[in-house]
Every structure is written in C-alpha cells, then in structure tokens.
Amino acid sequence: MTETPLLSVRGLAKHYQTRSATLKILDNVSFDIARGEVVGLVGESGSGKTTIGRSVLRLIEPTAGQIMFDGADVATLSAREMRRQRRRMQYIFQDPFASLSPRMTIGEILMEGLNIQGIGTKAERLERARKALEQVELPPDTINRYAHEFSGGQRQRIGIARALTLEPDFIVADEPVSALDVSIQAQVVNLLRDLQQRLGLTMLFISHDLAVVEYICDRVIVLYLGRIMEIASSEDLYARPQHPYTRALLSAIPSPDPDARTERQILRGDIPSPANPPSGCVFRTRCPMAIDACATTVPQLREVRPGHFKACIRDNI
C-alpha cells in the first residue's frame, strides 16, 4: 500500500497477570488497513481475534503497542479525546441478543451514541436513526419497538444500524453472523458488503468462517495464539497459502465439488495455553512441518511474494 493507511497497528500486546503466570493474549501484533479496505481476521477460538478488535477501539486497554488512526495515536488519547474519536470508530458485537438493552426502544438505542456525542437536535438525531434503519432494510416502525420483539437476524441489523448512526469511517465487525441461523447469515453478510461498498467504509472483519471471509474481505490476517502467522490478499491467500497453519484452516472448508476437495490436514493436540506458550514458533507443537530450529527461533513476518507475508523460518513448504 502506497497511501497512508487509515489504521496502523505496531507491536500491539495484551497481557493479563495472574498470581502464578502472565497470560500473553496478544504479542507483538502489527498490521495496516487502508481506507475503504475490508481486512479479515481469522483463527481458532482463543487466538486473540476479539482482543485485537477491542484493543484497537480501546474498549480494553492494550498492554503495549501503537495504534495510529488517521494520524492520531489512539493508545495515548485522554478519555475526552477518545470519546470524540469514537464517533469515527464503531463496533458491531457478536451477540445480537446481549448487545441490545431490553429496557430501551430501538430508537433510544440508535440515538444513544448521538446523545453522548452531542450531535444534532432531537429531531436531527431521530432522522439519523430512521436513516440508519432504512440502510439496514428495517421498517420505520422499528424505532418504537423493543429488542425482544425481533429475530436474531433483525437484532443484528439493529446492531449494524447503531454503528452507522454516527457515520463512522472505521468499523470492527466481531463475528457478526456467528450467532445467527445459517439461513440468515448470507443476508447479513450481503448487507454488510453492500453497505461497505456504498458508504466506503473501512472494516476489520473478525470471523472463524473462512468462506465468509473470502467473500467479503480484500485481505486476510491469520492469527494463532496471539501472533500473526500470515497476511495476504484474499485471492492469494486462498489460492497459495504459505503457512502450514493457514493450509490446515483452509483444508477444513467444506466444498460441494468432489473434484475441488483437498485432503484434510488435521492439527494434532489443542491450542496451547497463553500462560505457557511454546518457545520459538508458537505453532511448532502442532505443526506437521516443524524442525528443531523452530523451538529456538521466533519467526518474524517476512514477504515471500509481493504483498504476501508469513511468519515461518522454512521456505517452499
């Protein structure tokens, strides 16, 4: 990318201290997202995907690292400055049932951020809420109803509308369809894709569904135990994965075409505890291609082809 990225993350870390150990949930994570780009973040449960999303918006405080958003270091902003910044950075939560207050009307939920930011008159805020509902294809009378009156898919549309009311530049979509029925997931994914293209949104799309990520994302970041394993364009990553972990993930995607199916690569064991990560490469204990040097060398992200990076000391595997 030649232009200055909208979001630039360098050396992001999030550690939790217990009585007996330090939990390294994220460790030295760095990536960029260009304006108007959709970047997917994939990995197994417990890899740190949600922690990255929440750290970027400072919904949780990072332990270390720099988070540059349009030239401002988010990690160093005061509470007042961060409140102003949040009108440009919004979050779509995974659970559409838990993320909406049962005591508030949908209109009150949609206008809450506008009230906090002091944007517009009451009539102008109401108009923004109505516009957001229209953008997510919900009827106008939605505004006077309560969350329990809607299905899971409708609630997630309301969550998307809430993020849109502040007209943000950047959205973190944290597994926005994983809690929905399969029949509804495609509708919500298509809606997000349409909104992103129509409004020119920049998005970090967190998911464990690799088929959805391929459909909606321009580039993909593969995360394992709090470290980045691979970064590439969606097209290149799915066609020519360079890291053994990425290959294992992609081999698990079901295909209806018998001729297109690949041999399933089963990873041995479970993901290690962040309290006691393996030395060297954190993936080595489950990697089918590991060698002795993997136990002593921490692999750094390196460019193996134009725009394609992997964290692996081995070549041509």
UniProtKB/Swiss-Prot annotation:
Topology class, membrane: Peripheral membrane protein
Binding site for ATP: G43, E44, S45, G46, S47, G48, K49, T50
GO biological process: peptide transport; protein transport; transmembrane transport
Keyword set, alphabetical order: ATP-binding, Cell inner membrane, Cell membrane, Membrane, Nucleotide-binding, Peptide transport, Protein transport, Translocase, Transport
Subcellular location: Cell inner membrane
GO MF assignments: ATP binding; ATP hydrolysis activity
One of the Pfam families matching this protein, by short name: oligo_HPY
EC numbers, comma separated: 7.4.2.-
Enzyme class: translocase
Function: Probably part of an ABC transporter complex that could be involved in peptide import. Probably responsible for energy coupling to the transport system.
Record-linked PANTHER family: D,D-DIPEPTIDE TRANSPORT ATP-BINDING PROTEIN DDPF-RELATED (PTHR43776:SF7), TRANSPORT ATP-BINDING PROTEIN (PTHR43776)
Protein name: Putative peptide import ATP-binding protein BAB2_0818
